[in-house]
């Protein structure tokens, strides 16, 4: 941008000088007109202020048709180079009404060019922006003029495309606001200040917007602040333009010189192929190189190193073959060994050759990555730059040669992957089967341990322990100390019953401790089926529970004396029976009972 146009007043002065009366035939000063359009496009001045400055100059020059024609020509230059923000102001009612008034005039000898120019500007704006809702007022003006019978120029078949490109001028983007940098996302603070990129309009921190570049395509000729992304794009375009310039210089060389170089290169290739034909009996095809104008500076050093390495390998192979042939000629008496030696060498070299075929070298991998990067960078380049880039074509040929090996390596990798997947599935199945077998084995071990443990009989009358000798003091003495023999008293009315019950009770009290003691011994346990007589005797005689606790001994004695409680007491009058109190918890008789019966009740 011109440094003189910094204010609206400076813009007005520049507009007056660009449309000066001293310029004949309504022409304008093109340099000043471009400065005005750059000032409008660079957004240094407001779009509305710029529009009003142009309108002011148009209204001032009504009396002079040549000056007014120059003013409208300056308006046309600014409209086509001012950017979208300026087009919105030009297509507003404030400016379009003035243009409609001029276009609606009848053509005369003096104003024919002026009226034709205004009509053409309106028609171009209508054709380009008739579907734009923000610039809809242009369509209204066009319809009103058509209703008045104004004739507009006829549109050619490709006129719409050309018109759209005519108003497509790049302008600085609108500034956006944010609380953090759009690259590093660091929040803005008092120290970390925000800066706007003059190219893309984004907001960035000082670290990512420290570059300064002029933006002539946006009307900014002095260096301004740009972000890192815009700076990288500028550098890429700069390097690509240099490469295109070198290529154009090479194409500008004399045609005879290029043909001489092609002939020399073709002659050298033919000589090298003739030498290789005499050695290896190979007949390669010779093709004419179309892009042979590449200079030594453009050759890839990595490619040259790879070619030299392949030539050295070929030479070593020829030397080995020559040595083998000389050894075979020197020892003709050993034909079998001479025949077996190449086969052994071939068998050793077969895996190496297969490995070389299925794998890529580091140089080939670098070539593939370099080719991919170049293709990615040349997406935005024109088609001529892609076709004329010799380095890209050389890399394409080299990468194309590695395609079979890439496919072979990819298939091999897929095969290995599928094999590993199958092996993983088999291992999973085997592990599940092994876990099942292990659980079954552990379950069998637990069951066998449970079945091997001795169990006491649940029915004491079904099995009988082997009795120990009755003379053993360990079975009789402890019970005699802890369980004294109970004494039973006879009564007058039930002496016979007591006499019958006493032997059974004594037998039960003597045999129960022995049986209880024998039931505790685990070793030597041999269950036997008891005899029917013993079973009937045991069932008919009352028995005590095994090893009764001390607190339950009185209850057991009561159970043993149950037959005594069946003594028939004499009947007494019913009206003298009384209920016992809660403290006694039993029924008592009236005072008419005898002292002997009271004593008997107390003993019970």
From Swiss-Prot:
Bias (Basic residues): 241-253
Q: Which GO terms describe its biological process?
A: ATP export; cellular response to nitrogen starvation; microlipophagy; positive regulation of protein maturation; protein retention in Golgi apparatus; protein secretion; protein targeting to vacuole; protein transport to vacuole involved in ubiquitin-dependent protein catabolic process via the multivesicular body sorting pathway
In this protein, which residues make up the domain named VHS?
A: 20-153
Q: Which organism is it from?
A: Eremothecium gossypii (strain ATCC 10895 / CBS 109.51 / FGSC 9923 / NRRL Y-1056) (Yeast)
Residues bound to Zn(2+) 1 are 181, 184, 205, 208
Ranges annotated as biased composition (Basic and acidic residues): 254-263
List residues of the UIM domain.
260-279, 298-317
Carries keyword Amino-acid biosynthesis? Answer: no
Q: How does it assemble?
A: Component of the ESCRT-0 complex composed of HSE1 and VPS27.
Primary place of residence? membrane
Residues that bind Zn(2+) 2, according to the entry? 197, 200, 227, 230
The annotated region (Disordered) lies at: 241-263, 314-335, 465-604
- What are the entry keywords? Endosome, Membrane, Metal-binding, Repeat, Zinc, Zinc-finger
Cellular component aspect of the GO annotation: endosome membrane; ESCRT-0 complex; vacuolar membrane
Its gene is VPS27
Its job: Component of the ESCRT-0 complex which is the sorting receptor for ubiquitinated cargo proteins at the multivesicular body (MVB) and recruits ESCRT-I to the MVB outer membrane.
Biased composition of type Low complexity is found at 488-499
Q: Where in the cell is it found?
A: Endosome membrane
Composition-biased stretches (Polar residues): 507-523, 581-597
ZnF start-end (FYVE-type): 175-235
Task: Name the chain's protein.
Answer: Vacuolar protein sorting-associated protein 27
Name the PROSITE patterns on file: UIM, VHS, ZF_FYVE
Q: Record's superkingdom?
A: Eukaryota
**Membrane topology term:** Peripheral membrane protein
Q: What are the GO MF terms of this UniProt record?
A: K48-linked polyubiquitin modification-dependent protein binding; K63-linked polyubiquitin modification-dependent protein binding; phosphatidylinositol-3-phosphate binding; protein domain specific binding; protein heterodimerization activity; ubiquitin binding; zinc ion binding
The record's family statement is: Belongs to the VPS27 family.
Q: Which InterPro entries match?
A: ENTH_VHS, HGS/VPS27, UIM_dom, VHS_dom, Vps27_GAT-like, Znf_FYVE, Znf_FYVE-rel, Znf_FYVE_PHD
Asked whether the keyword Zinc-finger is assigned, the reply is yes
């Amino acid at each position: 941008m011109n440094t003189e146009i910094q204010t609206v007043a400076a813009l007005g002065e520049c507009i007056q000088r660009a449309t000066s009366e001293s310029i004949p035939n309504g022409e304008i000063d093109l340099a000043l007109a471009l400065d005005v359009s750059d000032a409008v496009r660079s957004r240094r001045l407001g779009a509305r202020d710029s529009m009003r400055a142009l309108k002011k100059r148009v209204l001032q020059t009504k009396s002079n048709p040549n000056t007014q024609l120059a003013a409208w020509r300056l308006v046309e230059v600014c409209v086509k180079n001012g950017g979208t923000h300026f087009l919105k102001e030009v297509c507003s009612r404030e400016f379009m009404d003035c243009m409609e008034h001029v276009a609606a005039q009848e053509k005369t000898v003096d104003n024919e060019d002026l009226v034709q120019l205004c009509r053409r500007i309106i028609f171009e704006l209508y054709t380009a922006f008739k579907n734009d809702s923000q610039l809809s007022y242009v369509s209204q003006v066009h319809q009103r003029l058509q209703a008045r019978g104004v004739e507009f120029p006829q549109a050619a078949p490709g006129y719409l495309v050309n018109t759209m490109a005519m108003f497509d001028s790049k302008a600085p983007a609108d500034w956006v606001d944010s609380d953090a940098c759009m690259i590093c996302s660091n929040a803005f603070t008092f120290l970390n200040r925000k800066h706007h990129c003059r190219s893309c309009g984004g907001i960035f921190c000082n670290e990512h917007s420290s570059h300064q570049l002029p933006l002539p395509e946006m009307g900014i000729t002095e260096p301004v602040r740009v972000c890192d992304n815009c700076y990288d794009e500028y550098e890429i375009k700069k390097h690509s333009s240099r490469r295109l310039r070198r290529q154009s210089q090479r194409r500008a060389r004399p045609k005879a010189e290029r043909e001489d170089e092609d002939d020399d290169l073709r002659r050298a290739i033919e000589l090298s192929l003739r030498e290789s034909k005499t050695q290896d009996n190979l007949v390669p095809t010779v093709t004419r190189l179309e892009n042979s104008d590449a200079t030594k500076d453009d050759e890839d050093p990595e490619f040259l190193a790879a070619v030299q390495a392949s030539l050295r390998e070929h030479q070593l192979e020829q030397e080995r073959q020559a040595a083998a042939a000389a050894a075979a000629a020197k020892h003709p008496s050993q034909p079998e060994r001479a025949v077996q030696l190449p086969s052994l060498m071939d068998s050793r070299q077969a895996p190496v050759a297969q490995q070389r075929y299925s794998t890529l070298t580091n140089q080939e991998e670098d070539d593939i990555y370099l080719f991919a990067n170049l293709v990615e960078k040349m997406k935005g380049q024109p088609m001529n730059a892609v076709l004329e880039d010799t380095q890209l074509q050389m890399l394409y040929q080299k990468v194309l040669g590695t395609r079979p090996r890439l496919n072979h390596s990819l298939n091999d990798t897929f095969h290995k992957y599928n094999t590993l997947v199958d092996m993983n599935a088999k291992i999973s199945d085997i592990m599940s089967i092994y876990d099942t077998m292990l659980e079954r084995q552990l379950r069998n071990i637990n069951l066998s341990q449970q079945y091997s443990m001795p169990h006491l009989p649940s029915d004491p009358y079904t099995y009988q322990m082997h009795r120990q000798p009755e003379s053993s003091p360990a079975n009789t003495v402890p019970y005699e100390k802890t369980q004294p023999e109970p004494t039973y008293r006879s009564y007058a009315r039930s002496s016979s019953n007591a006499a019958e019950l006493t032997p059974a009770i004594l037998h039960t009290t003597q045999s129960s401790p022995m049986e209880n003691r024998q039931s505790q011994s685990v070793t030597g346990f041999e269950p036997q089926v008891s005899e029917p007589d013993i079973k009937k005797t045991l069932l008919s005689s009352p028995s005590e529970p095994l090893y009764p606790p001390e607190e339950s001994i009185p209850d057991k004695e009561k159970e043993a004396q149950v037959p005594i409680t069946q003594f028939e007491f004499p009947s007494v009058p019913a009206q003298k029976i009384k209920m016992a109190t809660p403290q006694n918890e039993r029924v008592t008789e009236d005072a008419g009972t005898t002292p002997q019966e009271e004593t008997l009740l107390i003993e019970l």
